[in-house]
Swiss-Prot record:
Predominant cellular place of this UniProt entry's protein: membrane
Location relative to the cell: Cell inner membrane
Role noted for this protein: Part of an energy-coupled inorganic carbon pump.
Keyword list, A-Z: Cell inner membrane, Cell membrane, Membrane, Metal-binding, Transport, Zinc
Domain of life: Bacteria
Binding site for Zn(2+): C359, D361, H543, C558
Organism annotation: Bradyrhizobium sp. (strain BTAi1 / ATCC BAA-1182)
HAMAP family (UniProt xref): DabA
PANTHER family (UniProt xref): INORGANIC CARBON TRANSPORTER SUBUNIT DABA-RELATED (PTHR38344:SF1), UPF0753 PROTEIN AQ_863 (PTHR38344)
Family: Belongs to the inorganic carbon transporter (TC 9.A.2) DabA family.
Protein name according to UniProt: Probable inorganic carbon transporter subunit DabA 1
Keyword check for Cell inner membrane: yes
GO terms under cellular component: plasma membrane
Amino acid sequence: MTQAALAMSITATDPVDTATDARLKECIDSACQRVAPLWPLKHFVAVNPFLGFTGQSFAATAATFERVVRTRILMPRAFYRQALDDGRIDDAALARALDIHPSVGLGVEQLKQQARATAAPSSPPAVVATVAEVLDRLAEGDRYVSLVAFMIDEISAFCAGYFDEGQASWPSPVRSLKPYAAWRRLAAYDRNPEVMGLTGFRNAIAELPADPVQAIGLIITRLGIPERAVEDYLVRALFDIGGWSAYARYIGWSAERDGQRDDTLVELLAIRLAWGYALFQARTDAAFKIAWAQAMEEAAKLPDDQRLDDTPELAVDLVLHEAYEIAIRNQLIARLAGHGTGAAVARLPARPPVQAAFCIDVRSEIFRRALETAYPEAETIGFAGFFGFPIEYVPIGHTRGGAQCPVLLKPAFIVCEAVKDADDVEQAEVLGLRLLRRRAAKAWKSFKVSAVSSFSFVETAGLGFAAKIATDSAGVTRPVPSPVVDGLDPEIAARVMPRLAPGELGGRVTGFNDVQRVAMAEAALKAMSLTGPFARLVLLAGHGSTTVNNPHASGLDCGACGGHTGEANARVAAAVLNDPRVRDGLRAKGIDIPADCWFLGALHDTTTDAVTVFDEDDVPAALAQDLARLKARLADAARLARLERSALLGIPDKSAVDAAVIARSRDWSQVRPEWGLAGNCAFIAAPRSFTRGLDLGGRAFLHSYEAERDDGHRTLELIMTAPMVVANWINLQYFGSTVNNAAFGSGNKVLHNIVGQLGVLEGNAGDLRVGLPWQSVHDGTRLVHEPVRLNVFIAAPESAMDEIMQRQPGVRDLVVNGWVMLHSLGDHGTTIRRCVSPGVWIAA
């Protein structure tokens, strides 16, 4: 094709119908579904960054990201080469990986040669280019500010002001409008683009339709996007501003959970495309038109993502990654299959003195093992840390609270905070004082940061903060008060507890009635496989973390509690299960809790491994010695757990581990107060006897499950559709943040700046960052997290899991498309088989 013909092809391309074109709307909806949501910092939870791609295979997704998003979801070739050289990938793993990807057409030795060769830089055979990208290519080598970067900065600046949740001193004047309309209103006065050489920017935006969908359709037509490339072009545009797209998707996700519809992401897509359209209109030169026509011609020849031979370098890397995972999986399977269970079972009495239920979080695996060492007679249990109580917990002085349940669920009940043993007068006094202190703190902050008073404030009051800076630096005080106790006197904070009695708050019903309590208690106990015998003390230990100066602090708290600590859920569950009327109701349902059994709510601090037991004064006097023994054993277990974690934390002096770990939790310069869930690679749903005594290194989610107690496999279905999926989200967030932190992580923690109280920027500009900081997966010299997809092991009949996968297409997609590796555990874990697809199981 001649250059003239190429230039003319922009107008010759068949136009895509705009406002009434159902196909366009399908493309928009489909593109928006590709974006994974990003929860705000106040309840930051792990999300699978590939959530919108689980309907296709892992390999196809790798090809899609290279071709459409122009980024990788695998490690660099050098990583696999090093693993080969270190012996972490053996020939057997390579051969198995080649069997999975036969289209690569290589033998083991050929693959090793390819791995050790320097991969030639290559691009996929057909890509989806954007206007800004084409313009940047044309300007390569010039002293030139990237238009892609400029566009992202400008959109990010608008979003930061528009979505602000209270950080900005001056709220956006267009907040009342929808995003697209608000942006167009501001764009009419914005001269920044024209200063950058984008002539006619404001006119180009003004001529676009006011409706975002119509604007998208018009832009697609004017740009001449081939019909088969429309959806990919929209996906590419959304991933150009992936962080803000993810936050907009969160807004939509929240609306969908409440049965509503929200088009914030569509509006943001229109803004992004409008920028491209303005760039397109500003360039009328032949060089650009020819380059754009070539890009559209290439986009019209999009390949099938399944044809990995179109991208041979990617195919080699996929096989190498598969082999890397197989080698790690084989080691894990060998350890599980070779672990004896008889001795562990024999040590447990028929009625253990203590049963301690912990969250399935991988950090609990270390503590459970430590507690079983310190207290061999104790039985530990693994269950999602919300303990089956999906509540919205409303602190004193608030009208709304946080969702204390997995983000896949919607809170079913509202529980308000109250002061124990306080009458109505004292409750009102506490509420009024807290509100007064918060208003005063807000006014003081406004005075400190306002444009007029900030300079005089530093001059007159700066020295007064010297002592505070010193004590904060020494870890004696916190730079910012904990929101849990902010505005409360210490003696009042110690008396705060959840109020279970039915009530009303702002027109909403709060608390539980007796029928609801019995139903929730029954469901929780059955899901934990805890229906008897019951110990004298049953500990329900939620978990949270203690850090300072950490924007992602909630990401270290309990994901099953929606990015909050598990304290509220543990205390609510314990209070319900101690209720005599609830026990009467449970007895009628076949669950008999003895009179001498008491449930305790507790909180495991994953940063320090300290365990706090709540409501001790309610424990019957007859159990005082039992409680004292339990607390002593918990303290022993904490020391053992800290000692085990000290190596990874880089604490060389074993005699000073306790002090060093606690100091990290108070150090505002510490970028790695703990390792979170780094290293996670397995999810095991089985009786504890399958794994008791086995050191899994804090890498496995452990969920207690006894198939023989599960009538109709209802609990199994709950496990596979909720905890297993949440573990998959966590695993793939760590995976993405490791393989490509620039795209799926949040970069360097040291450079983070909070924006709008909802997320972080790396530096003072650029896109909103998603995922985990680099310091969460890397210790400065090596990776701490191994990028491995989740290996799931369930002690249940394969036929039952097959039926669940047939009923649950989302779970089936995860298994069949290789996002999790599902295995069955038979014969006490000595027989392990992997699921290829429902009904097809092979030897692992």
